[in-house]
């Protein structure tokens, strides 16, 4: 067969470009209405991709909010996006239209790691029967294995004891706390998933944590966004393996852990953990092609719970200790409350929380100020809705700017300062604000919120009960400005943990 010459290819290329431009134009004309949210003028085909600051998206979105208002639109290639800002817009979209905004936009690069119609996990699953089935299963299994009961609290308290022992091993010398916090929180998730914990020096455990962090970094930023809006690029030979090498290794390691766990599973015995409970559901679902209980989805659910349950809580605790060394006055008040309510012998319990308003306020203020997931997880509309007078068509991706609520100067007295009094009334009682929504809101609010609250309170109080934290002598005062990435993390810092 004769190959076309260069002169023959030019008309084909020109026709293809014109065709793409026409498709792009027709796609956008559907949204050209006075009721559609305004936004920056997009470029042909690429849309606003090159106009977004992927290094600091919250700051970039704040500038666009000042220019266009609480709702503004973006075009990411052929994907229409609306960014929601401010409490009224977020509550209207996520609560009033809870079911209509509960869908997720597809992440095409996930298809290469076992993510598919019958294996969507929980966090990123499309809204429908499979998501309902998995969320219901996860919530009921968490409850069965102790969420809200004494058993899980004992797991967390025991892990807090191990964490304190690891802090004590540094003998008051400077160290970075984030790795130990990662290990402690990850062990709580491992207890729920595999009914076991890892030793902190276990090489396999260390590799699991490294791969988990690599996966999160690989899935954030400009390149993953580009691959998602132009999925045809995913077919370039070798590209996926290079861009998502950490994710590929992480999934392979999860497969190893699950294979080992299946060998020890006895269907005749009560389930030891979430994995056993899932395997039992897989057996029940055999012969049902519509069920979301299958081996591929087990891997995705486990990955979801590791990533959503570990990194967010450990990052929040890393911020909490940073604020304690930056604000020794706050640290002193927390320790005073611990001494009065718990003492220095008995271990903290969740029952203590109701009698510790200042400590509770500090934890909430850490979550508000740290703002670790400023843009939440994207939603997608399943039908036309109207928010703040603007029409948002079916199939539009929604970016939920949680930072616009957590740092709203019309709600918080000192939005850009660490100020625990945001959560205290004039009498010193704890009060919770409607604008406090680090776990999002509505139908897709974080299912691990109760577990995260338990971990934050027990780990934080156990550490402050045992140690006083300070900036190492001779080191500069750390910054309280975060680094935006998959999560907003503190800049690297060290502290000294002195036994009390």
From Swiss-Prot:
> Quick one: which residues bind heme?
446
Q: Which tissues express it? A: Brain.
EC number, UniProt record: 1.14.14.1
Q: Where in the cell is it found?
A: Endoplasmic reticulum membrane; Microsome membrane
Catalysed reactions, as listed in the record: an organic molecule + reduced [NADPH--hemoprotein reductase] + O2 = an alcohol + oxidized [NADPH--hemoprotein reductase] + H2O + H(+)
Q: Tell me the keywords, alphabetical order.
A: Endoplasmic reticulum, Heme, Iron, Membrane, Metal-binding, Microsome, Monooxygenase, Oxidoreductase
What's any one GO cellular component for it? cytoplasm
**Which cofactor does this sequence's record say it needs?**
heme
The family annotation for this protein states: Belongs to the cytochrome P450 family.
**What is this protein called in UniProt?**
Cytochrome P450 2D4
Query: What organism is the protein native to?
Result: Rattus norvegicus
